């Protein structure tokens, strides 16, 4: 009528009595809660003074640690007591702690998942059967970290994108708890693609030369730019075009040269267009800076015909290069 170790199953207590004399009047079964110390009458079996064997049973469904004793009384009011060994019953699932501390916002700093688990009996500070394992699985269902009662994992470059990790805690009687967390990890800067060329003269190389004095650039944050197999990106957060003269940077506030995005979107894009022919800007160069919602940044320097004219101190007709 006992278990020698923890069990997840209900425990059946069988009480057998024998009286070959005046007969068994009744048997009382008491349960002692080893956690609280409370003794409770859980069985009152009236046998009316019959002789011979009697069999009674009680099923323990509430989890906990218990032992039982039975008191048998015959028709002459003689009593005898018998005790059981301890019963260890665990119905509670493990509790996973720490998932809520994982950064789930877009970031370019590798997030870490650090979790632990407990296996207390419900409503107590008494440990039940205890933890067998804590495991972390990636979105490909591959095991990436494991421990007996805790586990941690820091994302790698191959985890770039939006990824859901599953945490699984198992106790020693087979109860399993699961939790999940979705990380958003972006380490690929936005891309800037345009019509500029590389100009070479007298051994001097000038990259980003706008030969027609028109700034025409496409900016996006698509996942094809990632070399790590990202499944999603944070999207463009801002695009700003500057005129740079010496150490002075001046923002060009036009609909085609300045934009701030409200929320992350993998497929966000912006097309920069600026006709220097219409402005006759006297600047050293132009600078495009774009950032995504994870904090990655891309810069691009562009030069115009006027820049080359100043650099080489010669006459350059528009469209000559």
Q: What spans do the regions from the language model cover?
A:
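Solvent-exposed loop/turn segments flanking beta-strands in beta-repeat/beta-sandwich domains
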Residues: 17-33, 119-138, 212-245
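Conserved structural position at the C-terminal beta-strand
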Residues: 72, 169, 289-290
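Short beta-strand segments within Ig-like beta-sandwich modules, predominantly Fibronectin type-III
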Residues: 43-51, 142-149, 261-266
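Short, exposed coil/turn segments at beta-strand boundaries within extracellular/luminal domains
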Residues: 76-81, 172-178, 293-299
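Hydrophobic beta-strand segments within extracellular beta-sandwich modules
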Residues: 68, 165, 286-288
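Surface-exposed, short loops/turns at beta-strand junctions within beta-sandwich domains
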Residues: 58-65, 154-162, 273-283
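Short, solvent-exposed loop/linker segments at the N-terminal edge
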Residues: 2-9, 103-109, 198-205, 321
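Flexible, low-complexity linkers/stalks enriched in Thr/Pro that connect modular domains
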Residues: 83-94, 171, 181-190, 292, ...
């Amino acid at each position: 009528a006992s278990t020698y170790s923890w069990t997840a199953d209900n425990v059946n207590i069988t009480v057998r009595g024998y009286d070959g004399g005046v007969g068994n009047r009744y048997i009382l079964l008491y349960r002692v809660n080893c956690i609280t110390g409370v003794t409770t009458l859980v069985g009152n079996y009236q046998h009316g003074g019959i002789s011979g064997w009697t069999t009674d049973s009680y099923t323990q469904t509430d989890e906990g640690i218990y032992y039982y004793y039975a008191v048998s009384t015959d028709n002459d009011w003689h009593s005898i007591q018998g005790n059981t060994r301890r019963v260890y019953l665990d119905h509670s699932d493990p509790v996973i702690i720490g998932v809520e501390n994982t950064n789930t916002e877009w970031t370019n700093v590798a997030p870490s998942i650090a979790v632990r688990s407990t296996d207390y009996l419900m409503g107590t500070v008494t440990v039940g059967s205890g933890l067998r394992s804590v495991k972390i699985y990636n979105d490909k269902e591959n095991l990436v970290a494991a421990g007996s009662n805790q586990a941690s994992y820091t994302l790698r470059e191959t985890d770039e994108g939006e990824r859901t990790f599953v945490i699984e805690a198992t106790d020693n009687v087979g109860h399993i708890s699961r939790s999940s967390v979705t990380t958003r990890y972006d380490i690929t800067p936005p891309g800037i693609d345009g019509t500029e060329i590389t100009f070479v003269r007298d051994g001097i190389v000038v990259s980003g030369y706008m030969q027609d004095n028109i700034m025409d650039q496409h900016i996006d944050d698509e996942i094809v730019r990632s070399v790590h197999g990202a499944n999603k990106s944070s999207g463009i957060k801002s695009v700003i075009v500057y005129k740079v003269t010496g150490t002075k940077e001046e923002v060009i506030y036009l609909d085609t040269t300045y934009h701030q995005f409200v929320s992350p979107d993998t497929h966000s894009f912006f097309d920069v267009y600026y006709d220097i022919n219409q402005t006759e800007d006297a600047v050293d160069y132009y600078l495009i800076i774009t950032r995504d919602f994870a904090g990655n940044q891309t810069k691009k320097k562009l030069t115009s015909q006027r820049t080359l004219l100043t650099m080489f101190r010669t006459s350059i007709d528009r469209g000559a290069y």
